[in-house]
Amino acid sequence: MDSNTIINQTPILALEQLTYSYHTLSGETKALENISFKISPGEFVAIVGPSGCGKSTLLNIIAGQITDYTGNIKFHDTPMRILQSHSADLHIGYMLQHDHLFDWRTIYKNVCLGLEIKNLMTDENIDYVLSLLEKYGLYDFKDKKPSQLSGGMRQRAALIRTLALNPELLLLDEPFSALDYQTRLQVSGDIGNIIRENKKTAILVTHNLSEAISLADKIIVLTQRPATIKRIVDISLTITDNSPLGYRTAPEFNEYFNEIWEDLCDEN
C-alpha cells in the first residue's frame, strides 16, 4: 500500500496504552504493557516476537475474547468496549493455525457456516461465496469433504469462510504453521494476494520472520514478557520475481531481516 495513502486515512484500529495481566496460582502475571499502535484501512501488519511473549493474547484482546485489559482499543474511532456493550457486529474475522473445517460438511457447506449461523444465506451472499470459490480454485471441489483436500486447499477454504462474512479486519494467528515448508510458501503467498485483492485490513501473528517481511506493510516487534513494542518497521520491497521465494531477491530484504532478527535475538 502507498505510504501517503496510509498516512492520510483514519485508522480502522487504534490501540492506546493497552496493558493486560492475568492471575495464576503464584500471583498476577503481566502479559502486555503499554501497547500502542494504529492500523489504516487496507494495511497488512505482522506481529513478531519471542515465543510466549503474548502475540496471540494480543489478537484475542482485539477480537474481543479477552476484555479485562486496561487502556483503550478503538475501532473506527469508537471505543471497542462501547461497541461490545451494544452487541455491535465488529466485522472482524479470525483465522487460526488449524482450519477447523468439519468433515461431515462439504467445502461449500463449511465456507457458508458463518452465513448460516447469522441467518445471512441470501442470494447475493451465496453468489459471493461461489465467486470466491471459483476465483481461488476451489469451485470444482465444493462438494468434496475437507479430508479429500490438501492442507493448502483447506486453508484457502478457511479463509473463504472468513471472507464470506465480509469482515473489515482479518486476524490471522499462525495460519500457515501446520503446513509443510513448500506448501507454506505457496499458501502464504496465495492468502496474502487474496487479502490484498479483496482490499482487507489484516494483522498476522507469525514466528516466521521471512514470511512477515514478504507479506506485511509494517512489522510490529514485541519484547519478551511483559511484552512492549520494541520497534515498528515499515516494509517496502522491490519485487521483480513473482515466484514463491521471489521476495528474497528484493534488495531491501536482507536489511529488514537482519535489523529485525537482531531485535529478536536481543530478547532471547
Where is each model-derived feature located?
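The feature captures the beta-strand-to-loop junction immediately N-terminal to the Walker
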Residues: 48-50
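Helix-to-loop junction immediately C-terminal to a conserved catalytic motif
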Residues: 63
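ABC ATPase NBD Q-loop/coupling interface
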Residues: 72-90, 122, 238
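ABC ATPase NBD coupling module
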Residues: 79-96, 117, 243-250
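Conserved ABC ATPase "signature" region
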Residues: 123-141, 193
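Conserved ABC ATPase signature
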Residues: 145-149, 153
